[in-house]
Amino acid sequence: MLEKISDTLTFECETGNYHTFCPISCVAWLYQKIEDSFFLVVGTKTCGYFLQNALGVMIFAEPRYAMAELEEGDISAQLNDYEELKRLCIQIKKDRNPSVIVWIGTCTTEIIKMDLEGMAPKLEAEIGIPIVVARANGLDYAFTQGEDTVLAAIVHRCPDYKLQNKTDLTDNDIQEDATRFSFLKLRKNNIRSISATNSHPPLVLFGSLPTTVSSQLNLELKRNQIEVSGWLPTQRYTDLPSLGEGVYVCGVNPFLSRTATTLMRRKKCKLISAPFPIGPDGTRAWIEKICNVFNIQPTGLEERENKIWDGLEDYLDLVRGKSVFFMGDNLLEISLARFLIRCGMIVYEIGIPYMDKRYQAAELMLLQKTCEMMNVPLPRIVEKPDNYNQIQRIRELKPDLAITGMAHANPLEARGISTKWSVEFTFAQIHGFTNARDILELVTRPLRRNQSLHELGWNNLVKVNSQ
């Protein structure tokens, strides 16, 4: 199946299986980002094994997430789901006293039709802690969409935006805003609506990034006279940004299309469709688009980008002319491919589990522009790739590097194809100007390893038995 969206950009759609992590893995980074939260995954033993093995947290670390394990009595409706969840949440409140409890639904809760959304409001009122329900189950296309589901659920809990020209609030304003957080002890400055004192409308960025990276992006925008009003998610649940008509929002990750839709439809926010700030070229385009929307002239971005490229020259010498093949895993493929093409690499194919063409429209345009600038043909973009067909194409093309999910890495290595786990790009700091070096460090590691082995005369990693 082919779908042509422009004169030169063509998508292919196959019917392959999704060999990817489960979306409940979003707990791994979200519980660290939202510091006053507690994540309760409602699922089976399989979910528990996955969390324990994938996250690898020591038992003494006492992480702020737990597993509510479904047993036969739950599935056969012999036990009262509400009473069981109430018992667990009371225990969580006693031990941790979080500002919010996030229930993560799984495949099993979908199959047995467990009414988590119906139970949450009643239990929330009973125990006095907000409960957010997110169905981050394995029915999604990619594991990164678990974060998308959680953020979309949190959007509904954000206070409504009120345009005010003065910072003082009346008692009525405070009382109205406090109803949304009636279970929390909020200070007056926590529930203050965004004040219209800036030269531009309020801007809220959405996407979970490490605090250092989000601070860097805030600083880059501040250099261009743009103040960020808030982030989603915030480090503390009690500091959620105000959202509503007149608030502009912009995403930092390509897998947050559900959150973007919720912000536009439910909160009436205005979405800034921009390329994602991955790589110096993407970060510059991201800032320029935001400045353009606010009618602000950006300053010094070209010099800033050129300086970063100059600092990457030692890595660029290693990747220039090398070929790469994306098998598709985490929805970061388009942004990473665009950056690597700009670095001088040849991208044979971009496999991607799912493509929201509206949300990624600006990124696709930048990909096309980058290919024209580097004078290279546009790569194949294959949605829902069939892994068997991909293996045949990899055999024919013989790329220098395949960026793939963990399931295919070892089999490809055994066939002489160098690989890099795509999940590493999910957990690495890849956003902003200064983190472009980290992307190239990941990409060049297998290439440098091969070069070192070749110098030692070790041309094969797989031992071949002599006849």
UniProtKB/Swiss-Prot annotation:
GO biological process: light-independent chlorophyll biosynthetic process; photosynthesis, dark reaction
SUPFAM superfamilies, per database record: Helical backbone' metal receptor (SSF53807)
One GO CC term, this protein: chloroplast
Compartmental location: Plastid, Chloroplast
Residues that, per the record, bind [4Fe-4S] cluster: C22, C47, C107
InterPro entries registered for this protein in UniProt: LIPOR_BchN/ChlN, Nase/OxRdtase_comp1, Protochl_reductN
Top-level taxon in the UniProt lineage: Eukaryota
UniProt cross-references to Gene3D superfamilies, sorted A to Z: Nitrogenase molybdenum iron protein domain
Protein keywords: 4Fe-4S, ATP-binding, Chlorophyll biosynthesis, Chloroplast, Iron, Iron-sulfur, Metal-binding, Nucleotide-binding, Oxidoreductase, Photosynthesis, Plastid
Cofactor: binding details: Binds 1 [4Fe-4S] cluster per heterodimer. The cluster is bound at the heterodimer interface by residues from both subunits.
Gene Ontology MF, one: 4 iron, 4 sulfur cluster binding
Pathway(s) this gene product operates in, as recorded in its UniProt entry: Porphyrin-containing compound metabolism; chlorophyll biosynthesis (light-independent)
Cofactor requirement: [4Fe-4S] cluster
Family statement: Belongs to the BchN/ChlN family.
Summary of subunit composition and partner proteins: Protochlorophyllide reductase is composed of three subunits; ChlL, ChlN and ChlB. Forms a heterotetramer of two ChlB and two ChlN subunits.
Role description: Component of the dark-operative protochlorophyllide reductase (DPOR) that uses Mg-ATP and reduced ferredoxin to reduce ring D of protochlorophyllide (Pchlide) to form chlorophyllide a (Chlide). This reaction is light-independent. The NB-protein (ChlN-ChlB) is the catalytic component of the complex.
Protein's UniProt name: Light-independent protochlorophyllide reductase subunit N
Annotated organism of origin: Chara vulgaris (Common stonewort)
Gene giving rise to this polypeptide: chlN
